């Protein structure tokens, strides 16, 4: 009896620890990226994304090949180009759009907009795959959309370009989720193996555009910045932490239930919003805060509805279900793929 009690306490402690370290890495990566764009004046989102991809490629190789902390999931060479490469392309676009939006709009606004991802995923699955969704799923999306509309209307630091980048980032995230269900069918990828295969492709895809479009700007920045080497160390550290974030996602998925994962994910957004406001002091109106709150409550309610419907007895109409390991595919920068690098 006492052993059972100790085991439950250890399980709860491990779950809490996994959530806290996930929050810590996620919030730190977001704040560091915003700091790089705003405080260090390094306004080159393609290069920032490329650094993150390189660090993640190296980190995944070390974890799987050197330290052997995770077994390698073997992928047929043909499937790497036929399945992994298209996923890597969408993944690359998703991360770049997230960093572009972070350059132009506050963290609080960007994180709130990304909460639209469940809605865009449902709509795309309905339009493209003609999947059936219970009316309760559609109803649960109303507060999410309403909250984001209220937040957008009342945002004091609104920027059209940043808003569009975040919005298209949601569409890219949703597309990635839908593609994962078909292209990665048969492969049980965890977040580390996903990074191992996709990050090198993403580096290859983004390397040339980053070099051609941002090379001159980076050289000018390097000459004008008072301490460029210190800034580059911060940039490199943000890439290392971005990989650590993926490792923390694997840990939290293994240590929590689906409901806990959903609630913790939405609370994580609230933590990121609060911490970013404490650091950058971007103006937030009362109605803007209300809109953000409505959105987060709506996301939590949406997760609850999906979980409730997934537990229905066989034979009862069910909604399409996304496995938890596809809910947050390698957010090398932002966490939610329903986020994420």
UniProtKB/Swiss-Prot annotation:
Q: Which family does it belong to?
A: Belongs to the TPT transporter family. TPT (TC 2.A.7.9) subfamily.
Gene transcribed to yield this protein: GONST5
* Membrane topology according to the record: Multi-pass membrane protein
Q: Which residues cross the membrane?
A: 17-37, 44-64, 89-109, 141-161, 192-212, 233-253, 260-280, 284-304
Name-wise, this protein is: GDP-mannose transporter GONST5
The subcellular localization recorded is: Golgi apparatus membrane
The organism is Arabidopsis thaliana (Mouse-ear cress)
State the protein's purpose: GDP-mannose transporter that may be involved in the import of GDP-mannose from the cytoplasm into the Golgi lumen.
Upper lineage is:
Eukaryota, Viridiplantae, Streptophyta, Embryophyta, Tracheophyta
A Pfam family this chain is assigned to = TPT
Q: Which InterPro entries match?
A: Sugar_P_trans_dom, TPT_transporter
Gene Ontology CC annotations of this record? Golgi apparatus; Golgi membrane
* Tissue spec. comment: Expressed in rosette leaves, flowers and siliques.
All copies of the EamA domain together span 33-152
The processes (GO biological process) annotated in the record are:
nucleotide-sugar transmembrane transport
